[in-house]
């Protein structure tokens, strides 16, 4: 299952639900605006 915002993530954007990206700086999923 994908991770929602503020869940910790370690790898790529694939971890985060659609529309979110893994912020390597902060270490969690964040909303991404294209």
UniProtKB/Swiss-Prot annotation:
Pfam families xrefs: Toxin_12
Example GO molecular function: ion channel inhibitor activity
Disulfide bonds: 2-17, 9-22, 16-29
Any one GO cellular component localisation term in the record: extracellular region
Keywords: Disulfide bond, Ion channel impairing toxin, Knottin, Secreted, Toxin
Protein purpose: Probable ion channel inhibitor.
Protein name: Jingzhaotoxin F7-10.36
The organism of origin for this protein: Chilobrachys guangxiensis (Chinese earth tiger tarantula)
């Amino acid at each position: 299952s994908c991770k929602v915002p503020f869940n910790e993530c370690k790898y790529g954007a694939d971890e985060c639900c659609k529309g979110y990206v893994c912020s390597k700086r902060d270490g969690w999923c964040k909303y991404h605006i294209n």
